[in-house]
Amino acid sequence: MKDCILITGGAGFIGSAISHLLHAEDNRTIVAIDNLHPQVHPKQRRPDDLHQDVELIVADICEPETWSRFMQEWRPSLVIHLAAETGTGQSLSEASRHTHVNVTGTARMLDAFAAAQHVPQRIVLTSSRAVYGEGVWQRPDGDLFQPGQRSKSMLDDAQWDFPNAVALPFCADITPPNPTSVYGATKLAQEHIINAWALSFGADVAILRLQNVYGAGQSLDNPYTGIVSLFSRLAKSGLSIPLYEDGLMRRDFVYISDVARAVLAASKEQAAVGRVYDIGFGSASTIKDLADEVARHYGAPAPHVCGKYRNGDVRHAGCDVAASLALGWKPEVTMAEGVARLCDWIDVRLSEGAV
């Protein structure tokens, strides 16, 4: 049996970026398991962005046979668990699909390790800010409360915010998880399942709750993820970017290179063990700010409020990254710089006919 670094979902956006950092800093063989789902990989082939030395196994993590074949050859000392269905809105209409992949797929992996009597030294899970739902809000008198999910009647009446309150940044040490989407619920389940298993078997665990990840290498075909790439393609076509709600909902956009560095740190640093860290830029921007930045880059018409909303979306999401500094990590790429990098990459991809 051979040692390796296992990256589940390793042919995706984040996995491909991590593969290059790991290859540069670690001499272990890197094995990626990915089913190359057509929603993410419409061409059904190995992505160009995945490091050429990564051994790619095209298989479904939900199938026991995938793991029996894998464990016949490999004994991973490090597991980076990325594989997941990630559509927040889509998870409400395809709940069984998201639950099957995110929960059952995780359990299948752990069952395979247990059956082979193998315990990885460390498991790094990329979780999501979706586990917080709307998070914690504060009233003018200082009272804190968790508002829960915005109701359909609120959204239909264009009552976007909770009245007389402001949303506070998410912080893993103090913000209780309270998911408002099926996707968020499955990511929280992943955290609980992996923590319970690792505590029983003696594996180290590090969990990163990622904010909105974007950047060069992001899928330009998946309509359910990647708002920055979607905006970029619209603006490049000379179209006005439509803004849902009033365009003033906030998100914390973190560039892919910063996320890849955070995952690498979580795989190595002792400070990561047994902790949950929030990974974002540390300041939230409105969707309108983002759309304005993209429109300026392409000289596109000003974005417009379209009056629509998306089920499952939270109003505001941002995080406090102070705790994550313990990993020796901090975000570096500003939104303006990140948007410019992404748009330049999209221009090259389109000129090459790659999308």
Q: What kind of feature is each model-predicted range?
A:
Residues 91, 162-181, 205, 209-219, ...:
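A conserved pocket-lining segment of Rossmann-fold NAD(P)-dependent short-chain dehydrogenase/reductase
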Residues 109, 194, 231, 323-324:
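Structural element of the ATP-grasp superfamily
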Residues 189, 193, 197, 227, ...:
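Hydrophobic alpha-helix immediately C-terminal to the catalytic Tyr-X-X-X-Lys motif of short-chain
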Residues 59, 165, 235-355:
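C-terminal substrate-binding subdomain of Rossmann-fold SDR/epimerase-dehydratase oxidoreductases
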Residues 8, 100-103, 183-184, 221, ...:
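Short, solvent-exposed loop/helix junctions and linker helices
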